[in-house]
A protein has these predicted regions:
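Short, compact, well-ordered microdomains
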Residues: 94-145
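N-terminal "domain-start" segment
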Residues: 1-110
């Protein structure tokens, strides 16, 4: 049975990648062995597909702000509803903000494990600029950064 302890094992056993992956249909997002491990172990291939669907907004934000680092967060409630959000840190005028949302999507059902007795369980991934030419971003687990 897959529990949140399985998730902790995934995050704990991935510290870097010897191999990089991408979807055949989208060259601007690469991802690490840790993200592949997350997808395979939790049968959560939809996570990368969702991030790909957000990449237009990420690239637009990158071009406007030159910010090269984003956080992808998935929040899962006990009733399995939740959200997926991409955000970054940065300045708006002269004011610094540690949470500038790029895109936020409510998701009616998320099949990821939750922490017992926690109202919401969050999963974090990092999305970092990998190449300028061609423009590519890398999705990775925090333990791989």
């Amino acid at each position: 049975m897959i529990t949140y302890n399985t998730v902790k094992q995934i995050y704990g056993r991935n510290f870097g990648s010897m191999q990089i992956f991408k979807r055949d249909y989208f060259n601007q997002l690469l991802y690490t062995e840790g993200v592949m491990d997350f997808q395979k172990t939790l049968n959560a291939f939809w996570v990368v597909d969702n991030v790909i669907s957000y990449m237009g907004a990420v690239i637009k934000t990158f071009k406007e702000t030159e910010d090269t680092f984003f956080i992808v967060e998935i929040g899962v409630m006990q009733d399995k509803t939740g959200y997926m959000e991409v955000f970054h840190e940065g300045y708006v005028g002269n004011d610094y903000h540690d949470h500038l949302s790029v895109i936020y999507q409510k998701i009616p059902f998320i099949d990821l494990p939750t922490i017992v007795d926690e109202e919401i369980t969050t999963y974090k991934f990092y999305l970092s600029l990998h190449n300028y030419e061609p423009l590519q971003f890398m999705l990775l687990l925090p333990s791989e950064y």
